[in-house]
Amino acid sequence: MKKLILLFVVLPFLTLPPTALADELDTPAVAKPGELIVEVNGVVCSICAKGLKKNLAKLDFQSPVLSEKSGVKIDIRSGRLVMHRDPAKPIDFDAIRVAVKKGGFELAKLYMHLSGSLDSVDGKWLLTEKAGQNKFALATVPAGLAKSNAVTAHITINASAVAKTKPGQIVPVESVEITKGVSD
């Protein structure tokens, strides 16, 4: 009986094509409103990630509604942690990087869902978050959008962009999907 149960547990993993798992890890995460997804290199088990979760749960911009136990969720297969944040508080991106490093891992990327407005300063596009104090530098803006447009965006931030970035500073964004109008 034990062998039969073991067979049913192991069989799906043996028949899963290796490319299916690789494709899942290559797809960008899509954050929901109020979420900050932290992608980390090197997370292989939940025991290893316990210290990392604890470090991230201590950060100041966490949602006040959530406790330390429920504030950070982890998906071991993808190496992604989901944090719920208070949008009214500025995010200390460097503190995220430091917390991940203290946990013994390397920060790869951050994913966020934002609502805010576009602005153009010195020929560069900025996305200012509606509820918070965070500003993000955009490389390009889709056609049809203009200064002061209300937008909703899914952004990806590379780990190198957050090094030494303090709350309130403009954070460069690696890739972005912007739609006109706010739809939270």
Report each predicted region and the residues it spans.
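Positively charged n-region of N-terminal signal peptides that target proteins for export
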Residues: M1-L4
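Bacterial N-terminal signal peptides
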Residues: L7-P17
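Boundary at the C-terminal end of the N-terminal hydrophobic targeting segment
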Residues: A20-A22
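Short amphipathic alpha-helices in soluble, non-transmembrane regions
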Residues: L52-N55, D94-G104
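Structural detector for short beta-strands of small beta-barrel domains
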Residues: K109-G123
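Flexible glycine-rich surface loops and low-complexity tracts that mediate binding to linear polymers
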Residues: L118, S148-S175
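Beta-strand/loop nucleic-acid-binding surfaces
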Residues: G132-K147
